[in-house]
Amino acid sequence: MSLRLASILALSLAALGLPAQQAIAQSPSVAGTWVNDHASVLVIQSVGADGSVTGTYANNAPGYKCAGVAFPLVGWMDGTRISYTVRWKNASVDCNSITSWTGYFNDGRLGVQWVVTFDEYGAPTIRTGSDSYTRR
């Protein structure tokens, strides 16, 4: 459902005195597997009616010590906007980092900016960057 159509529907429901929250929260169909230029794999398993996002992420960037391991992600969607976070730690491995991505879907692509926090040489470090994903 387009954002314009969702907005019109929400206003129509409001005029009738009906709840419009679900109509406003509609997001494009993004569930599935997405891959970026570093072959990292984002799997969006579900987008709830409230906009909550669940899935997994496997970072395959060169030199990453936890490459290929899928970690859970949590996040939110609102229309075409998305934000999600991965804590790179599970029962088997601790990569000592957290990454958050924020961006939007446009023309079948997902463009995001990311921020990662980790310790480098014993000092807290923050790095930023951007990625573009296509559906696999």
Q: What residue spans do the PLM features occupy?
A:
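Bacterial N-terminal signal peptides
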Residues: 8-17
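Central antiparallel beta-sheet cores of small beta-barrel/beta-sandwich binding domains
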Residues: 26-101, 105-106, 114, 121-136
